[in-house]
């Protein structure tokens, strides 16, 4: 097994660390759950608007029309998926009951896992390709990716744990988002190698950025406010952005950003 692939696997596996942190102790309170949703929104927004979309537009051979077109395609793709999934009344999330939480929270957990998985897949490809071309830079990007996969795992595990009451399920779902990154690295190892087209990679990143922005603004932030109306979800958003910003600083320090 190649060193770049090992780095990609380790970076993706860091999601499980966040997942375990998300299920330790008692079942998350509404306040903690709302914070975790805002935290996830902050992560997604910063990654999408400050890293993925600019990188996609700056890629060699990428035109602004194609870049922004794929971004809009991602937005519309999210709303298409959103319409296919069942809706429940948001105020039902506030009910304190021994019954399982309503489908709206489970639906959000599904979309959150999907959104982060879609981000992690091309990220796994990027980690592998970078490490293949320059192992020193590969170590840097793998470290930064691992650091921000920890809060991503936490952000996924919290809502899933609240929706299902099962720690095992929460860890599994969070792990799926990390496995998507590993899958991207494995496919790059098997098929793409170092020959992946910059335009194809940029188009994927732009579309995923659109999906993540739509998910954050339309789903995560409103639901966080509905779950805990007494607190501002912006605090979670700002914390998520701060943690992710620190990870991006590590990328730049490594000479990748």
UniProtKB/Swiss-Prot annotation:
GO terms for cellular component: plasma membrane. The keyword Translocase does not apply. Zn(2+) binds at residues 123, 148, 152. InterPro entries: ZIP, Zn_transptr_ZupT. Fe(2+) binds at residues 120, 123, 149, 152, 181. Its main location: membrane. It is a multi-pass membrane protein. Keywords: Cell inner membrane, Cell membrane, Ion transport, Iron, Membrane, Metal-binding, Transmembrane, Transmembrane helix, Transport, Zinc, Zinc transport. The keyword Coiled coil does not apply. It comes from the Bacteria. The chain crosses the membrane at residues 5-25, 32-52, 61-81, 137-157, 171-191, 195-215, 236-256. GO terms for molecular function: metal ion binding; zinc ion transmembrane transporter activity. It catalyses: Zn(2+)(in) = Zn(2+)(out). It is found in: Cell inner membrane. It holds the Pfam family Zip. PANTHER family: ZINC TRANSPORTER ZUPT, ZINC/IRON TRANSPORTER. Mediates zinc uptake. May also transport other divalent cations. Belongs to the ZIP transporter (TC 2.A.5) family. ZupT subfamily. NCBIfam families: PRK04201.1. This is Zinc transporter ZupT.
């Amino acid at each position: 097994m190649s060193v770049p692939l090992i780095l990609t696997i380790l970076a993706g596996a860091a999601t499980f660390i966040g997942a375990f942190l998300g299920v330790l102790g008692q079942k998350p309170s509404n306040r903690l759950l709302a914070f975790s949703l805002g935290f996830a929104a902050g992560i997604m927004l910063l990654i999408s608007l400050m890293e993925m979309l600019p990188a996609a537009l700056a890629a060699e051979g990428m035109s602004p029309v194609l870049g922004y077109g794929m971004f809009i395609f991602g937005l519309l793709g999210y709303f298409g998926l959103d319409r296919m999934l069942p809706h429940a009344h948001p105020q039902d999330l506030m009910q304190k009951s021994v019954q399982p939480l309503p489908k709206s929270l489970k639906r959000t957990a599904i979309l959150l896992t999907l959104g982060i998985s879609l981000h992690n897949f091309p990220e796994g490809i990027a980690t592998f390709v970078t490490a293949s071309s320059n192992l020193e830079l590969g170590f840097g990007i793998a470290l930064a990716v691992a650091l921000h996969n920890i809060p991503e795992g936490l952000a996924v595990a919290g809502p899933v744990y609240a929706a299902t009451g099962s720690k095992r399920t929460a860890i599994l779902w969070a792990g799926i988002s990390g496995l998507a990154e590993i899958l991207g690295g494995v496919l790059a190892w098997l098929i793409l190698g170092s020959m992946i087209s910059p335009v194809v990679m940029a188009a994927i990143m732009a579309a995923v950025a659109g999906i993540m922005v739509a998910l954050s603004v339309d789903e995560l932030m409103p639901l966080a406010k509905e779950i805990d109306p007494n607190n501002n979800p912006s605090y979670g958003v700002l914390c998520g952005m701060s943690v992710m910003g620190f990870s991006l600083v590590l990328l730049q320090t490594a000479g990748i950003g």
